[in-house]
């Protein structure tokens, strides 16, 4: 009880701090209302229990409250072990699915906490900010943060649905993917969201033909973004260099669905060794985005699918100029032996300009080199409710970072590019299938 009360007191303090920030937000500001292309939802416990057939309720995703036996995060890998009832150890809420036991952690939902209080520890739903999982509370927290609209990546399914891709029962996994997408569209982004929450759906990654069907099913109800892996081979899946993904990519091309890749969507964060502390991986979180972008630029897919767009959530943007320079040099000087002469017929930087978007929330270097990236290729994010989030001061952070830029450039970065890419209304709202 003491632990729960302590956390509740902290939440109250965070709310008071947020109210102070809200008062500051009421001061007139020329900074545009933010459209964040990378926030996160923590799925409520009922998502799959309400939507799966009854025969799967005891095997599909469900939550239990249990103690933590041990948890490590080294070498880019997260390894929690759930204890038995009565065991010593901090108690948290866990998702259980087949053999998987995955706890809710403070890193999943850290907003409202001082940096030194954010640790790798298990928590319960009561110990997180309600805006993590509740639509009405989320909109209130967005108001505090000068955010109008937000695209949200998943938590329990992981950033591109790896949880279901790794499952043994593929029939159940497909039902889980569809149930998540139905919840995302009908509830999370439903009427209560008033167009301010933008749907991002999952696909059955193990079957590109089923993936194409799911893209089209969701596009028919207005969805324009789908989660995908930065580096599919890390998940035991084909790379983008072959033709295995073409049915899925064709569906995205035809429907205007953006392929959205979040750091960590390869189920491993960049690191250097098994014993490297988390700080090493945290410093180089962009690395898989970098590798992935080169894959796409050298794959020829943007020429084969001319309407295809991809975006990198939380990858930041400062690394992009040199990679484009290097890719152009390799294409110009080495394409004969480099294996791309027959598929890439223009400089990679030209393909980037028409097809790739970088996303950032804290990248002063990238903003100083915006001319080498392209104003039209940059999107803004707040990463609520993760530990890196700029909530509740995303406006102030943005003003500090972009104060040197013309107002029309700031407008494009903070709103305009997202409106165009995601097919939002001129006011920055999601219309659904209307």
Residue ranges with predicted function:
Residues 2-6:
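Extreme N-terminal basic, low-complexity initiation segments
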Residues 153-158, 263-268, 384-387:
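Short glycine-enriched loops at secondary-structure junctions
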Residues 24, 172-173, 189, 196-379, ...:
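Catalytic pocket-lining loop regions of alpha/beta-barrel enzymes
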Residues 117-126, 158-172, 209:
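Surface-exposed, active-site-proximal loop segments in enzymatic domains
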Residues 35-42, 259-264:
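Histidine-centered catalytic micro-motifs
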Residues 37, 43, 153, 229:
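Conserved residues at the C-terminal ends of beta-strands
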Residues 151-166, 190-198, 211:
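Substrate-binding cleft and catalytic face of glycoside hydrolase catalytic domains
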Residues 8-34, 43-121, 125-149, 179-190, ...:
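Mid-to-C-terminal alpha-helical segments outside catalytic/metal-binding sites
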């Amino acid at each position: 009880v003491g632990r729960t009360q302590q956390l509740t007191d902290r939440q109250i303090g965070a709310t008071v701090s947020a109210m102070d920030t809200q008062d500051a937000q009421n001061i007139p500001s020329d900074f545009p209302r933010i459209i964040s292309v990378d926030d996160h939802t923590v799925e409520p416990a009922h998502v799959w229990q309400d939507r799966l057939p009854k025969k799967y309720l005891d095997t599909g995703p469900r939550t239990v409250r249990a103690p933590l036996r041990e948890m490590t995060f080294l070498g880019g890998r997260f390894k929690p072990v759930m204890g038995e009832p009565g065991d010593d150890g901090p108690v948290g809420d866990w998702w259980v699915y087949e053999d998987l036991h995955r706890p809710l952690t403070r890193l999943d939902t850290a907003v409202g906490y001082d940096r030194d209080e954010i640790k790798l520890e298990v928590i319960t739903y009561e110990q997180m900010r309600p805006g993590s999982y509740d639509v009405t509370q989320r909109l209130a927290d967005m108001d505090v943060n000068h955010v109008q609209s937000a695209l949200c990546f998943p938590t329990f399914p992981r950033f591109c649905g790896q949880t279901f891709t790794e499952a043994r029962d593929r029939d159940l996994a497909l039902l889980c993917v569809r149930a998540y997408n139905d919840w995302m569209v009908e509830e999370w982004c439903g009427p209560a969201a008033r167009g301010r929450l933008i749907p991002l759906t999952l696909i059955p990654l193990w079957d590109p033909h089923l993936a194409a069907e799911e893209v089209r099913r969701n596009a028919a109800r207005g969805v324009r973004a789908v989660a995908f892996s930065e580096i599919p081979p890390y998940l035991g899946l084909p790379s983008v260099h072959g033709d295995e993904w073409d049915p899925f990519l064709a569906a995205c091309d035809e429907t205007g669905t953006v392929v959205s890749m979040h750091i960590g969507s390869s189920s491993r964060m960049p690191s250097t060794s098994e014993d490297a502390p988390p700080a090493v991986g945290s410093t180089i979180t962009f690395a898989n985005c970098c590798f992935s972008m080169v894959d796409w630029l050298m794959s020829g897919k943007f020429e084969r699918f001319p309407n295809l767009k991809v975006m990198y959530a939380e990858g930041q943007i400062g690394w992009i100029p040199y990679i484009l320079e290097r890719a152009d040099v390799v294409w110009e000087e080495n394409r004969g032996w480099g294996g791309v002469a027959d598929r890439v017929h223009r400089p990679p930087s030209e393909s980037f300009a028409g097809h790739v978007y970088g996303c950032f929330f804290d990248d002063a270097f990238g903003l100083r080199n915006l001319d080498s990236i392209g104003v039209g290729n940059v999107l803004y994010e707040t990463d609520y409710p993760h530990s890196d989030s700029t909530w509740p001061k995303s406006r102030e952070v943005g003003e500090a970072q972009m104060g040197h830029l013309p107002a029309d450039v700031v407008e494009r970065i903070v709103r305009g590019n997202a409106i165009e890419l995601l097919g939002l209304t001129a006011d920055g709202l999601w219309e659904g299938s209307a």
